[in-house]
Amino acid sequence: VFIAPNVCITTAEHAIDAEQRNAGLEVAKPIKIGNNVWIGAGTVILGGAEIGDNSVIGAGSVVKKDIPPNVIAVGVPCRPIRQITEEDKKRYPQYPKDNI
């Protein structure tokens, strides 16, 4: 997993009711981040979300629902915009294998 700067991963959720909040009641929901995920800078991931393997989350996104594997997802709320293709893998500079 590659996590860029200023990413917030939080499992805590609070009640809307002020009396419950003042009592300190909160719920923690698990977060699952798959293998080979890239999370862009400033992204917020909220409790209960699952990000599938090999997905890319765009900078500044708010992930509150599940993101499937092998997609590019962005936005507030974060949504998949498309599958990652073989062409995507060729588009950016390839580093020599002996440097990896």
Regions found by a protein language model. Name each.
Residues V1-A49, V76, I84-T85, K89:
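Flexible, glycine/small-residue-enriched loop-and-beta-strand segment within the central core
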Residues V56-P80:
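A contiguous, mid-protein "functional segment" used to position or interact
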